[in-house]
Structure formats: C-alpha cells, structure tokens
C-alpha cells in the first residue's frame, strides 16, 4: 500500500503537524539534546507558529498518511536551482520500509518537472556514524550536519 501525501495548509493540519513533529523530534533527538534544549528546538523550529511561518515563506509541508493513519511528515522548498528537502520524519514502525525513499523520489520528479537540477538535504551526522565520508580516521564526525546532494540527470 502506498501512502498519500496531504498538503498542510489549514490551521488544524498545521497543529496536527506540530504535534507529530514534537513527538518525532523527541523520539529521534533525545539521545543528542538535553530535554529542555530539545523542547526549545521543537518550539522554535516545529511549533504551529514556526510551521505557519515556514509555509508563509514558501515551504510546503505534507502529512504522510497510510491506511487512514498519519505516519509522518515531510517539507520541501523550491529554490532557484534545486528542491531543498527540509524535513522527513516517519514514525519508528514505518522506517526501513522504503517510504522515505519514495518521498525522495517524488521530490526528484517534482524538481525535474520544475526544471531544477538537483535535490538536497541535510541530516544529523551523529545519527549515522557508519557513513565513511562523514568520519575522520579517528572515528569522530567533523560536523554536526552532513549535506546530501543529488544532481538530477
């Protein structure tokens, strides 16, 4: 079964996205940030007000719905030469099922259709210590974030 992507535009969906973001961010980042700092990050970056401000600045948020259940969300912004995938979060039980890959492929198709040459995103390097390009020889990650860029052919 393929998920549906529901555009977040109305206030009730903005609030639902903010609630989901809080749940997922607390689950994903609890290992890396103290609770109070994480609460502040969520409030500043993924609260209903922050999401509404993003939407006002041309960021497109989508809820990921599978079988009538909201299982995640993603957000992207079209830039001059690229589509910037800003957020992609799925509930734990839906990870590893190629749903994220399908979202990225959808973004690639959209970018191509808009005449953009690439899709890019950043992710927390601390979550992916097995990525060799992000590691130094001593096994430490030199930066908190790694940029992934895919040039469209």
What are these regions (language model features)?
Residues 1:
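Short, conserved catalytic or adaptor-binding loops enriched in Gly and charged residues
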Residues 4-93, 103-110, 114, 143, ...:
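Acetyl-CoA-dependent GNAT
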Residues 72, 132-135:
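A structural microfeature
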Residues 94, 98:
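Glycine-rich phosphate-binding loop
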Residues 117:
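Short acidic/polar active-site loop segments enriched in Thr and Asp
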Residues 121-131:
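Conserved beta-strand-loop-alpha-helix junction that forms the acyl-donor binding cleft
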Residues 138-139:
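Short Gly/Pro-enriched turn/cap motifs at secondary-structure boundaries
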């Amino acid at each position: 079964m393929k998920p549906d992507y529901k555009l977040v535009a109305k206030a009730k969906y903005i609030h639902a996205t903010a609630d989901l973001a809080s749940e997922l961010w607390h689950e994903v980042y609890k290992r890396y940030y103290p609770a109070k700092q994480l609460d502040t990050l969520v409030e500043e970056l993924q609260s209903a007000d922050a999401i509404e401000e993003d939407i006002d600045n041309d960021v497109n948020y989508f809820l990921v719905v599978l079988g009538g259940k909201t299982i995640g969300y993603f957000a992207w912004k079209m830039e001059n030469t690229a589509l910037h995938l800003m957020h992609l979060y799925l509930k734990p039980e839906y990870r590893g099922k190629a749903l994220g890959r399908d979202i990225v492929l959808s973004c690639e198709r959209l970018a191509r259709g808009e005449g953009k040459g690439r899709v890019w995103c950043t992710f927390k390097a601390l979550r992916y210590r097995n990525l060799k390009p992000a590691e130094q020889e001593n096994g430490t990650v030199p930066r908190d974030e790694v940029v992934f860029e895919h040039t469209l052919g």
